[in-house]
Amino acid sequence: MSGLKLFYFILFGQSISLLGSSLTGFALGVWVYQTSESVMEFTLILVASTLPGIVLGPFIGSWVDRLNRKSLLVGAQAGSALIIMGLAFLYYYDLLRFWHIAVIVSLGSVFATMLQVGFTSTVTLMVPTEDLNKANAALGMVLGLVQLAGPFLAGKALDTIGISTILLIDIVSFSFGLGTLLLASLPSTPAKPADTQTSVWEEVKEAYRFLKSKPGVLGGLYLFTLIWFNVSAVQALITPLVLSYASPSEAGLIMSVAGVGALLGGAVMMGWKGPERRMYGILGAALAIAFILVLLPVYSSLVWIGFWAFVIMALAPVATVCSQTLWQRKVPVHFHGRAFSLRNTIIKAAQPAAFLSAGFLYQSVFEPLMKEGALLANIFGPIWGIGEGRGIALLISLFGILSIVIVLMAWSIRAIRTADTALPDENISRAAT
């Protein structure tokens, strides 16, 4: 088994595992929010679930380039399963506390980063260059399916079987991901051109120097980091926004509707393969999503939010597939682990700051000032409304406006706008066909 068949086989196992993780992630977030009634604690858990992977990402990438990919992926999958087992044990014996969750999801973040970087950098070893678009679109469809089924099932499960059974389902789901990895025969990583032994830190710096040598790439990364800051802030706020006037199962339904959009967008990208100009696809989709973020929270309507969530997630695969394919074609395969993890670290470094600032701005500034008779309510109330959840709504719209400005800045810089055509493709078509 090789090429796309091998990729699809491994992707099948990972999709089952991702579905289990999606159930746990959504259910755990709702459980923390409902038991603490604190947006700040909710956002702190989000920070704990991302920060360790971000900080250690470049070093993980270096090890991905050094180690046997199959052994690394199997180890990361097994480690993730053990983390969920520990969480289930604490919950079953009524020992689970906030700080337990923070520590456990922090460890889970490290294993998740190993899986993400390891799998992403292995795609170009399995799949021929001409099929990268199809593989990346298939990955987007899987993520859409997971987002479609996970939150909806988790919302229903919280109302019926409870979080303990959800954790058990997650543990079982890991066996599928682990099983396919054990059965698969992954291609070996090509040797580095220079036959020299360097430290992990030197390899991280080497990856940064490589990105810096690509005109427009590093500047684009920094600007996209600002966009990711805004998107992450909205991510932290959207669940409390919906829960301010809806039940957990209804919130799960909204996420599932968004998943349908991601599924549709991924299907379109598999058939269309995206625009010829990758950067136009990235920037165009980002600009459209930014405009939608301004409109999405204006009305307290599940239909309204569900519709725009669907559109956002239908557009997202255009940007993600174009971006992933661009990097896979422009970066030499022996750099993939370090380059991809460094890219993720630079972009996602804004995520914890976004989570914390969103929680603080909501609880301390926007929510109090959007109550009846307060300063912001008098100014913005006629459009965004007044009362519970309206502070979140206004804040999301402001993040959308900021995103529009950032995308337009990126579009105006020639080096960023032409990064897809100005840089030569690297010879990465190593996969067996």
Regions found by a protein language model. Give the residues of each.
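Helix-loop boundary and gating motifs at the non-cytosolic
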Residues: 1-54, 209-258, 347
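Short hydrophobic/alpha-helical segments at membrane-entry points of transmembrane helices
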Residues: 9-10, 96-104, 219-220, 303-309
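Intracellular juxtamembrane helix-capping segments at the cytosolic ends
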Residues: 28, 114-127, 319-331
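Loop-to-transmembrane helix entry/capping segments in MFS-fold secondary transporters
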Residues: 39-40, 129-139, 248, 333-343
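C-terminal transmembrane bundle of multi-pass solute transporters/carriers
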Residues: 45, 55-59, 66, 70-72, ...
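Helix-loop-helix hairpin linking two adjacent transmembrane segments in secondary transporters
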Residues: 93-96, 143-180
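Helix-loop junctions on the cytosolic side of multi-pass membrane transporters
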Residues: 94, 121, 125, 167-198, ...
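Cytoplasmic helix-loop-helix junction between adjacent transmembrane helices
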Residues: 104-147, 151
